[in-house]
Structure formats: structure tokens, C-alpha cells
Amino acid sequence: MATTELPKFELLSLADNTSGWGPLTTSSSSVEPVPFQQFNKADRIGRVADWIGVDRFFRRGNERYNERVYGSAANAGSQFDYIHGMDEHNFQLVDTSKPMARNPQRNFRVRQMHLRKMMQKEVEKREMVNQTTNLRMKRSIAKEQQRAFKMWQRRGGNARQGQRGQGGRFGGDRPKERLPSVQVRPEWGVLEEMNLSAFSKLALPNIPGGEDIGDHQYGSLQYYDKTVDRVSVKNSVPLQRCAGVYYNVTTTEDPVIQELAQGGVGNVFGTDIILATLMTAPRSVYSWDIVAYRIGDKLFFDKRNTKDILNPVETLTVSETSAEPPSFDGNGLNNARDLATEAFYINQNFRRQVVKRNEPGFTFKNVRVPFEDEETGDATGTAYKYRKWNLGNGVDGKPVELVCRTELDGVIHGLGNETQTLTIKAFNEWDSSQAGGVDWRTKLDVQKGAVMATEIKNNSAKVAKWTLQALLAGSDTMKLGYVSRNNARSTQNHSILNTQYVKPTEFASNIALNMDNCWGILRCVIDSCMKQKPGKYLLMKDPQSPVIRLYSLPEGTFDSERESSEEENSDDDQ
């Protein structure tokens, strides 16, 4: 068996410098062709000592830029340095900018959404421009119905709900004490109580429109001044004090109604404001009373003669149906009585100011008003039309024919120069910080619909009466004005801030005024009175609850008040 020999390991011979220290002056031939390059500045390979550049150790600052210190790049050789040549044959420009990441699908969707929004805004803008005031007011119908329901609850509609308060919740606030329109005397007997909440379910459909009675149209009207339509908050007009006569003639004192009753025309008689008060009874909050005379087979709805300018039926209430109506006997200017008087003077002056008083007007068949004062002969600025309606058969089987005295306030030229009749009314702003009002001077020009909705909410009963008066008179258009105090603490000076046209039929729909329901309420009251024997009766709205009570009055009741008022009027004339 052959044995294998391992290679021998031989150590290289080390050169020994016997003549001194340090490396030999001559190197081995095996390492001469190998270049040396210091790859790391921290390599401990270099000179052991440098006795030549001693003066460089004394340099300071920037003078030491070329100093070869340990670990400096100056100690490295240049064997592996890159030397840039001038060869530009292979030179290329490289774009080092970062490319933007694009999502074309996303950009398309964004542009499409933006376009849709722009188109939607354009459509909404056109709708707002083309939308009339009547359409905008329809948005307030739901709020109006909700408010009416809350008011019904607040007035005791939910009294049977256990311990719940009048506000429909536990611990609700009690209703404010309201005064009755007339003090009920012990000798007055209660014949019937009519719940106003049940009136909302009544309906008398298919009542034809009113018919003018012969030539019984009296007075003359002035044409409306269309320059008033340019009035705005920025271009307001001071409310002038216009002279004129206001006639407050009751039903039984009207000579035309007396003539018609004697001539057998109609069997139920009343004025437009009295009938409107009965037909809008569920909306009223304050107390009012109407005298009913049952004479033979005829019924007269009349009002009491009071010492005040206006009867509670004719009072232009202010913020009656608001959440916090003004009190009757409050101190200052903003009590209910003074506000109603202020509203009366505002309406009288407004309806005279907005017509052309110095120009020829429109004259009816009878120029002279039947109850006009022969001595003064002052024009009232109001025309009177006597109209009649057929309300079907009554409780006795005979037809119920209603005769009503209606009022018109002006005329205007319509399409084709046709003369149209006007009913002119005015809202009055007293203090926007009270009774849930809004500041007209900031919102009226830009949000007239919101201001109108607020007025309908706070004055539901008054607005409904105005609308019914226009419908009973057959008025073509209603002209509504917005009159505000110049100073909230003074009732002396006012300004007209804006005006507005509405059609009575459309406006009635906007305020949820159903004529079938109104005729049903009136017919119910007529039937209740016609069931009684001939005599004198009183219909009074309870001040605290939604109830109308029918009282029987002894003979001679209220006659002393009428005599005293007539004596005062005669003393004033003297």
C-alpha cells in the first residue's frame, strides 16, 4: 500500500533589517508589481514619522487645507481615481424628474360630479327665479298646521291626557289669563256650547259664488298707484297721515239691509267682518262676541256698540296666534289694545296713500254711500257691495239665503286695460325681538316669503279674516303692505318697506283656509240660532278655551250702552 505524502508548509523568510529599524530599503521582487491603495482612511498604514513638513503643524485655519494628517483623504493615492475624459460620443441626457401619477378615470369622475353640481345649482336657481310667492308660501302650510295643533293643545285640547300640562308635556306652562270681550251676567242663560275643535270637521261643499244684488253697489274707488310697487327697504316711503272718513255701521242700522229684509231678499244678514269672524272661529285666540237677533223667520248677526273705535269683532289684533302674544293690560306701547289701535290707523292710512287720490276714479252705480254724512260729504275711499249666497235648506226645510255687505278698497288696470277690484291691507312691525318676529329691514327684500310665513303664523286669525273678506266681496286681487315703525319705541312715525300682490283664492289655499269648511261652520252657527225662538242672543268666544257659547239675553240688554254711545256721539258733534 502506497503512502501519501502531505504537502509541506514552508514559511516565507522575513527580511531582517540588521542595520536599523523600519523596513528595508530594498523590497522583495514578488510584491513590486502589486500597487497599493489605501481604501480606508482609518487604515493604520502610512508613514511612521514625517520629519520634513514640521512647519505645517504650526498653520492655522484655512492654511491647513493641504495638510496631510492621519486619516485624511490627502494620504490616499490616485491609482484608482476616476479621470474624466473629453469623449462626448456616448453622452446622453437623462430626465431625472419624477413623473406624475395620473388617474384619468378619477379625473373624469371628478369633472362629471362637478358638472352635475353646476347643472343642479343652475336648475335650482332657475326654479327660485320662476317660483312665485304663492308657491313659496305653500312651504309654510305644514308649519302652520303644526302650529295650529300646538295652539289647540295649549288652549286645552289635551286636557284629558292625565297630568300633562296645557303645552302637551309634563309641567307645561299654564295659558295666560285673557279677559272676556264682555262680562257675562248671571241672568244670561247658556243655551249651547260649540266646541271649536269639532268645527274643523264640518264642511258644506258646492256653494256657488256670491251674486250681486241688483244695483246695490255704492261708492267710488281710486286707482292703485303702481309706483308703490317699487318701494323696498332701501327705498322706503314714509307713511302719510291721510284724512278720510271711516264708517262703522252695524248690520241692523244699515238702511240697505233693512230695505232688503223688508223686501224679502234673504233671511240671514250680516257684514263681511262679522261673517268672517264666525267662519274663522277655530283660529281665534282672543275673546269676541256677536249679537244675534231672531226676528220672525229672519236672523241678523250684529255687533255691540262700544265706546271704543272698534268692536272686538273688528279689532285688528297683532301677534294674536304667536307663541307669546302681547298682554292686554301690559305697560308701555306694546300691549294688545294699543297695538290693535296702531294697526287700525296704519291700515286706514295705507289704503288711502297707495291710491291716486287726486285723479278720477272708478264709480259704481250709486255714487253716494247710503250711510254717508250729508253735511260733511267726505269720501270714505271704500265701496260697498251687497251680495247673496244660497246655503241650502235650513232646519225648518226652508232655503237659507245669506245677504252680506262687503267692502272694496281700490281698483287697478289689469290685462287688456280691464278694471279689477282690490282689497288693500297692511301688516305692521312693532318689535321684531318679541312674539317670535323677524327683522323686516334685514330679511324683507331677500326673504319676503319667510317674512310672510312668519306673519301668517303670528296672525293666523287676522290673515284668514282678510282673505275671507276679499273672497266674500269677489275681489280680484289682494294688495298687502309691510309697514314698520321708524323707532321701535315710538308709534308716531312709520315707513312702508314693501308691498305684495296675492290672489284671494290662491292665498286661501296657501294658508290652509278651506271654503267648504268655512261655509260649514257658518251654517252650523246659523242652524243653532234658527232653532231658538225669536229673541236676542249672544255668541261669545271663551277667552280661555276653544268654545263658543250661545247665551239668551233678556230684552233691553246692551240698549243702555247703545244709548250712551249715541249720546257721546251727539255731544261730540255739538
Swiss-Prot record:
Protein name: Eukaryotic translation initiation factor 3 subunit D
Quaternary structure and partners: Component of the eukaryotic translation initiation factor 3 (eIF-3) complex.
Taxonomic lineage from the root: Eukaryota, Metazoa, Ecdysozoa, Nematoda, Chromadorea
The organism's place on the tree of life at top rank: Eukaryota
Free-text domain note: The RNA gate region regulates mRNA cap recognition to prevent promiscuous mRNA-binding before assembly of eif3d into the full eukaryotic translation initiation factor 3 (eIF-3) complex.
Pfam family, one: eIF-3_zeta
Family listed: Belongs to the eIF-3 subunit D family.
Name of the encoding gene: eif-3.D
Cellular localisation: Cytoplasm
GO biological process, one term: formation of cytoplasmic translation initiation complex
UniProt entry tagged with the keyword Acetylation: no
Main location: cytoplasm
